[in-house]
């Protein structure tokens, strides 16, 4: 069972999930940040994939992404930094990033590398739901990677049911 599903089956309330941008404030700190957060009792971690045009993010995350990119963070480097993370970290790990760098990496390769690295889920805020259902869902499910869709207060009841 995926670690996200396990977490929500064991603990249905008071789940603390923390987001941070990979490569910020330092390029080398990603894996150590994850380890410290788990030791401090965090239940799940969202790791931001820095992108040059983070249109859905606020100023703080935009600044962190810009600094991370200037520091040299790439998706390949992030996966390299996380390749041994599961030897020490047991909580669910979720990547959050825009579709462009994921497509440059190759969606199928991205999902395969997520599985091999121990990434449990991915949030892609600019992935249209229709495209996900028609093109990407089967690829992600084949690798046991959960694509987590976002909703807002304006999301229709019909769409929420589909998600």
Please name every model-derived segment.
Residues 1-10, 52-61, 70-85, 102-108, ...:
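Active-site-adjacent beta->alpha loops and helix N-cap segments on the catalytic face
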Residues 18, 37, 45-48, 114, ...:
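Conserved, mostly hydrophobic/aromatic
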Residues 3-24, 58-59, 64, 85-96:
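N-terminal small/glycine-rich loop or linker at the start of catalytic domains
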Residues 17, 43-46, 123, 149:
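Conserved beta-strand positions in the central sheet of alpha/beta enzyme cores
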Residues 16-30, 94-106, 148-155:
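Active-site mouth loops of central-metabolism enzymes
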Residues 95-127:
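Glycine/proline-rich, positively charged
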Residues 39-42, 119:
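A structural motif
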Residues 27-38, 110, 155-162:
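Catalytic cores of alpha/beta
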